[in-house]
Every structure is written in C-alpha cells, then in structure tokens.
UniProtKB/Swiss-Prot annotation:
Matching Pfam families: NEPRO_N
Protein's UniProt name: Nucleolus and neural progenitor protein
UniProtKB keywords: Developmental protein, Disease variant, Dwarfism, Nucleus, Phosphoprotein
Region span, Disordered: 437-457
Cellular compartment(s): Nucleus; Nucleus, Nucleolus
Purpose: May play a role in cortex development as part of the Notch signaling pathway. Downstream of Notch may repress the expression of proneural genes and inhibit neuronal differentiation thereby maintaining neural progenitors. May also play a role in preimplentation embryo development.
Example of a GO biological process term: negative regulation of neuron differentiation
Positions carrying Phosphoserine: S265
Disease link: Anauxetic dysplasia 3: An autosomal recessive skeletal dysplasia characterized by severe short stature, brachydactyly, skin laxity, joint hypermobility and dislocations, short metacarpals, broad middle phalanges, and metaphyseal irregularities. Most patients also exhibit motor and cognitive delays.
Family of the protein in this entry: Belongs to the nepro family.
PANTHER family: NUCLEOLUS AND NEURAL PROGENITOR PROTEIN (PTHR34761:SF1)
C-alpha cells in the first residue's frame, strides 16, 4: 500500500502524490484528552488554511499576473523582470496542481461526522494514518514551494526596480512592482498558516499511529520541527529585512517627478487658481464686448502665438495634392507638378534652433551625452505641443538609454552612435518622419490615381489608331485584288479609253502608241508587285501590329497608281 517513490526524488517534491487504497477513517473508543486537543487544533487550523487559500484577493492577483504576462509577451519576452515574473507564475501553477486545498478539505470533512454523534457516546472518528501522512507530505511540499515563490517575488521586485531606474516602461514596471509585493505579502500569510497547521497535524499522526499503525511513507520520517526542515530560506523570508531598493536607485526622485507629491501640491493649486481667475476675467470681457443687433455678427479672431526661433510645426505642413483635376491638362504638366510636390515636401528646414539641436547631437561623443541632448529636445517639443516629434525623439531616447548602459559596461559602439545621430539629424533637417506618415501614403495613392487617369486616354488613342490602320490595310488589299482581277480579264481586249477617259486629249497632245503601250506594261507590272507586297505586309501586320511603316508606304504607291488611272 506504499506509494512508489523514484530514487533520488523526495516524496514531498512530487506534484501528484497517489492516495492510499485502504479506508480513510478509524473509529476510536474512549478517546483521550490529548487526542481531543489535537482534533480541535487541527479542525481550527484546517478551517483557517482553507479560508486563506480560497481568498478572492489571491484569485484576483493571480488573474492580473496572467493578464500582464499575456499582454506583454511579445515586447517584454526577453526582459529579465518578465522572465522572473514567469517563474512566479510557474510556482503558482504548480501549487494549484498539488491540490493542497482539496486534500485539506477532505481531512476537514472527516471530522464533521463527530458533530452528529450524541454527547453520551464516547466514540470518535479520526482519519487513518495514510490520510494524515498524505496531508502532512503535501503541507511540507507546499511550504517548500511557497518559499521558492517568495524568493522569485523578491527577485522580480529587485529586477523591476532596476529596470524602472532606466525610465523605460514606467507604468508597466510600477504595476509589476505592486503586483509582486501583494503576492509576496499574501502568500507569506498562507505559509504561516501551513506552518501552524503542521504542528497539531503531526501530533494527530502520532496518536493515530499509536491507535492503529498503518504507515504509508515507510522510507520517509516526518520532521518534528518544520522550521528545521525548511532551513535557511525560512529564516531569510521571516527574519531577514528586505533590501531598500527605491532609496538605493534613486527611484523616489523619479516617481516624485512623475506623480505629484504633497510639497508640490500647493504650487499646483495656486497655478490652477491663477488659470481659473484668468479665464474668468476673459469671460467677463467677452460678455461686455457682446453686441446684440438682432443679427449674428462675425468677430474676426486673431490668433497670436509666441515667436520662437525654432518652429518645428513646419515639419507637419504637407502639400495637399488634389487627386481630382481636370483631364484636359497635359501629361507633362502633371509630372512636373508631382515632382514639385515631391521635392517641396523634402525641403531642408534651416531654422537656427534646429541647427543648434543638430550641432549638439553631432558633437555628442557618447551615448550619455546624446541621451542628455535628446532629453532636452523632448522637453522642448513637449512644451511646444509637437507630439509627433516628441514621440520620435522619445523612441530614440529609449534606444540611447539602453546603449548607454552597454557603453558603461565597457562596450564600444561607435557605429551605433553615428547611425542614431544621423537618423535624428535627418529627421530634424529634412523631415524624414513625414515620408512614412499616413498622410504621405494617401498623397502617393492620389498621385498614382492621377497618373492612371492621365495615361488611360493615350491607351485608347493607340488602340483606335491600330484599328484604323487595320481597316485601311484591308480596304487597300481588297481594292488591289479587284483591280488586278479586272486587269487580267481585260488584258487583251481593253480599250485605252476605259483606262483613260481623256485619251483623246492624250492623242491630240502628240503621244505616240509605243509610249502608251510601255506605260500600260509598267502599270500592269506595278499592280502585280503591289498585290504581292500587300499580301506580304498583311501577314507581317498580323504578327506584329506595331510595324505600320510598310503599309503606309504601300498605300502611297497605290494612291499614285490610281491617280495615273484617273480613278
């Protein structure tokens, strides 16, 4: 009936401990006072442990932990605080798989049968020795696991505070610090309850073993003092003071800058009161200046802005290209306009303040200096309400801070430094951030649509020209075949008056007969050559429609022949 224990693996370190196959309760006649005291103490401590394990606060904190890990898995998967928080989650999952709560609940329900018995009977029902040993073994394993959980919480706390000192993911790190602190406090209370449960439960085991011995774990002896069994981690968790990480890393100053403290609250309240008073005065002036003439009067609003040397708002001024234009404009004009808009969006902004920032960035010789300069630029952009530039510089500041710590450890990164400096300078001077904006993408789409609209009429013209050339070539081929056939039929009996209606004029003009006959022979030979060339050109046109030079030349020859014939 003993549980099989693999060599080299302690029974308390097993996730699933098999239950005993024998009966779970033993009836005791005339129980002694020591047994009654042990039963009462075990019932009390079991009830308190079950309440602490079923706490809704523990469930809520566990759900928050799982949600934080799930939502930040992609961007924080390689960060040390995130990995340490994963170890905390693994400890909680293993504690849940142990089914400690179910075992203690079963033990607690075995004692409930004694309440239904009358007081006159001196019979008591107690759990058997295998059941008590199983619960004791799970308590030992849970105490070891909770000590490991507390240690993981401490490591996560310290790593998160260290990461908070880098001024990266501040809100997330604060959430993790608070979450780990609450888990440490709550499970430390659960550990205390389990330690308090072990002592009366060990006394109950001795009484039950004396009444009816049925050992379940024969190769393992339960310790009488659980604190000695837990060893040094127990004393570190309960006796040793926790390190003060916030004061050592200067996190208090950072948090005081981000979140308002009591010393700064009077100043802030005074500033808000001054702002409210100014708004009230402006409202009074506006009420006095109102003119009621029965009709709405449009007041000209003049917005006056403070003059500044460096106006980064010019970055955001993009040329709006109208996609819908008249199709009567030439294609060359549209191309020139597109080129002007393209180059105008990339104009170099040479204001003094931008040049001063760029000069400072270029003079930075380390990531420490570069981070300071970027921080100043971010503060300036936020003061001028330049959100896009502040976000861009903030991302560069995060990268510079990470590389700054690598540089502090002795790593030389000159190429990285030059690359980041170049990208920042290009963004400030040439407005490279505009090229990747959504508005720029929309502008490019509208330009492409406009180009397509301009190109469509040309394609139509090309198709119509090809059709006309084909029709004309077909007509010339038919006319040439008809004339050649007629010429063959009337070759011998044709009269010169049919070919030349003005033959009388030719005869009167003194044209001799041999000359006319030679001309007729030349015309006949030309018609044959034209017919052959026409058929050849037709086959060539079917293969390649774009080659139209031959057909145009042939049609010119046919026109000359018909002009000579008088048709």
């Amino acid at each position: 009936m003993m549980a099989a224990v693999p060599p080299g693996l302690e029974p308390w370190n097993r996730v699933r401990i098999p239950k005993a196959g024998n009966r779970s309760a033993v009836t005791v006649q005339n129980p002694g006072a020591a047994l009654d005291l042990c039963i009462a103490a075990v019932i009390k401590e079991c009830h308190l442990v079950i309440l602490s394990l079923k706490s809704q606060t523990l469930d809520a904190e566990t759900d928050v932990l799982c949600a934080v890990l799930y939502s930040n898995h992609n961007r924080m998967g390689r960060h040390k605080p995130h990995l340490a928080l994963k170890q905390v989650e693994q400890c909680l999952k293993r504690l849940k798989n142990m089914n400690l709560e179910g075992s203690i609940q079963d033990l607690f329900e075995l004692f409930s049968s004694n309440e239904n018995q009358p007081l006159t009977t001196k019979v008591c029902v107690v759990p058997s020795q295998p059941v008590v040993e199983l619960v004791l073994m799970k308590v030992l394993g849970a105490c070891k696991l909770l000590l490991r959980l507390l240690d993981c919480c401490c490591k996560t706390f310290l790593l998160t505070v260290k990461h908070l000192g880098l001024q990266e993911f501040i809100i997330l790190n604060l959430v993790m610090v608070g979450l780990v602190s609450r888990l440490w406090v709550l499970y430390k209370g659960v550990l205390k309850r389990l330690i308090l449960l072990y002592e009366p439960l060990f006394g109950l085991l001795q009484e039950v073993a004396r009444i009816q011995p049925m050992p379940y774990f024969k190769d393992f002896t339960f310790p009488s003092d659980i604190t000695e069994f837990l060893g040094q981690p127990y004393f570190e968790a309960f006796k040793k003071k926790m390190p003060i990480a916030f004061a050592a890393k200067g996190i208090n100053k950072l948090l005081n800058k981000l979140f308002l403290i009591n010393e700064q609250s009077p100043r802030a309240s005074e500033e808000t009161l001054l702002g409210i008073s100014k708004k009230a005065k402006q409202m009074k002036i506006n009420v006095q200046n109102n003119v009621d003439l029965g009709q709405p009067v449009k007041n000209k609003r003049v917005f006056k802005e403070e003059s500044s040397e460096f106006d980064v708002r010019a970055f955001c001024n993009q040329l709006k290209h109208k996609a819908t234009q008249e199709t009567s404009f030439d294609f060359k004009c549209s191309q020139s306009r597109l080129k002007t808009t393209k180059y105008s969006s990339q104009k170099v902004i040479g204001t003094p303040h931008a040049k001063s920032f760029v000069q400072r960035f270029r003079e930075a010789e380390s990531f420490t200096q570069l981070s300071e300069e970027i921080q100043m630029a971010v503060v300036w952009c936020r003061s001028k309400k330049l959100k896009a530039q502040a976000i861009f510089l903030g991302n560069k500041l995060l990268k510079s801070n990470r590389l700054k710590h690598l540089e502090a450890q002795g790593t030389s990164l000159p190429k990285k430094l030059e690359c980041i400096k170049t990208s920042i300078c290009n963004h400030l001077l040439r407005g490279s951030g505009i090229k990747t904006s959504k508005h720029h993408l929309r502008q490019r789409r509208s330009q492409n649509k406009f180009l397509r609209r301009q190109r469509k009429p040309q394609r139509k013209l090309q198709s119509t020209l090809l059709r006309e050339i084909q029709q004309f070539s077909q007509g010339t081929r038919k006319s040439a075949t008809d004339t050649s056939a007629k010429w063959r039929l009337s070759h011998c009996t044709v009269h010169r008056t049919d070919l030349y209606p003005n033959s009388k004029q030719l005869l009167n003009s003194g044209v001799s007969m041999p000359v006319i006959q030679t001309k007729e022979k030349m015309i006949h030979e030309n018609l044959r050559g034209i017919h052959e060339n026409e058929t050849d050109s037709w086959t060539v046109m079917q293969i390649n429609k774009n080659s139209t030079s031959g057909t145009i030349k042939e049609t010119d020859d046919i026109d000359d022949i018909f002009a000579l014939m008088g048709v």
